[in-house]
């Protein structure tokens, strides 16, 4: 997403990045289109739930200083809606959780791929997944770690993750 990013916008939006709002709005739109909007929360309510830790995520006040919201945060917050509206994608994430029960990284990658696949308006590339999973302002790049985990998932016949036209996709 081509969102403005300045010191002021970061300060005003923390722990979210400008792109998160575009992602959230498009994700809510995709969920509404699939479910007819029944039972969906507003973007403001989802953000409040993330900040207060009411939808399954840890409250922002309980996070370390510098923590950033990610696509994983949004998936976790909207998991019930995703399960109802995009059953096959939700089940694919579940298969990753079964195959890699002790790896939060693999599970988080699956959640990020799921969000991007649902959106359908942003390439589901390794770089985008890595960027949208960046956990804190002080964290170094996770590109190589994520690349290794993605390769493990692609090479596991029980994980329905593949590549199509340079994008990661749940099959």
Where are these regions (language model features)?
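Active-site lining segments that contact anionic ligands and/or coordinate catalytic metals
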Residues: 11, 108-110, 156, 165
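A short, conserved structural fragment
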Residues: 151-167
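Extended, regular secondary-structure scaffolds
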Residues: 129-132, 136-151, 156
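Short alpha-helical scaffolding segments that buttress acidic/His motifs in well-ordered protein cores
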Residues: 24, 109-114
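C-terminal helical "lid" subdomain and adjoining coupling/linker elements of P-loop NTPases
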Residues: 1-105, 119-126, 135-141, 160
């Amino acid at each position: 997403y081509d969102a403005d990013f300045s010191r002021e916008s970061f300060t005003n939006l923390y722990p979210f990045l400008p792109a998160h709002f575009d992602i959230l709005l498009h994700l809510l739109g995709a969920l509404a289109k699939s479910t007819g909007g029944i039972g969906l929360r507003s973007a403001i309510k989802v953000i409040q739930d993330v900040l207060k830790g009411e939808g399954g995520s840890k409250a922002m006040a309980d996070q370390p200083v510098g923590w950033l919201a990610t696509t994983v945060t949004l998936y976790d917050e909207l998991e019930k809606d995703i399960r109802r509206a995009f059953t096959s994608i939700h089940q694919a994430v579940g298969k990753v959780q079964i195959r890699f029960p002790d790896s939060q990284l693999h599970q988080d990658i699956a959640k990020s791929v799921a969000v991007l696949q649902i959106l359908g308006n942003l390439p589901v590339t390794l770089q985008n997944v890595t960027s949208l999973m960046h956990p804190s302002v002080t964290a170094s790049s996770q590109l190589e770690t994520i690349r290794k985990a993605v390769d493990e998932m692609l090479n596991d016949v029980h994980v329905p993750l593949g590549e199509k036209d340079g994008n990661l996709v749940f099959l």
